[in-house]
């Protein structure tokens, strides 16, 4: 009886250690704050952020990431441009390396926009702290925008983000459970 009880205690302790390691080093929960990613991610929803997977698999255009905006705040935004990309918006239309890109995650906000445009017109060189002579995203930098462009504070306001600011890639939404979703890339977006 004592041996069986000891085995249970050890098993439970090992399970807690494994959960701690997974939670600390692989996936961490994050609560969405604000409306900048609405309707893709809404205020108060909870997501799991993969903090090592993006380092091994890399970030791609369309990934949703959490990053340190400053010492006190983390933001969640969508990657629009990666190092080496030439990015330009013309009247709400995205062009990457000269090719028009679909952004299905903007459909809802385009239908319900308050003004003429939700994203507007800009090039990489127009962003804060950018090289005014180049439209190419430099190595180690990313262009990120919120899906709710009319309210989002994103690269248009603070410029390109450094790779070392990135906490991780959003893997799945787990709360509310009725809204569970595991892939936020454009080809899986229905708005």
UniProtKB/Swiss-Prot annotation:
Cytoplasmic topology ranges: 1-7
Catalytic activity: Cleavage of hydrophobic, N-terminal signal or leader sequences from secreted and periplasmic proteins
TM region positions: 8-28
A GO MF label: serine-type endopeptidase activity
Superkingdom as given in the UniProt entry: Bacteria
One matching Pfam family: Peptidase_S26
Keywords, ordered alphabetically: Cell membrane, Hydrolase, Membrane, Protease, Transmembrane, Transmembrane helix
Topological domains annotated Extracellular: 29-191
Role this protein plays: Essential for cell viability.
Protein name: Signal peptidase IB
Classification lineage: Bacteria, Bacillati, Bacillota, Bacilli, Bacillales
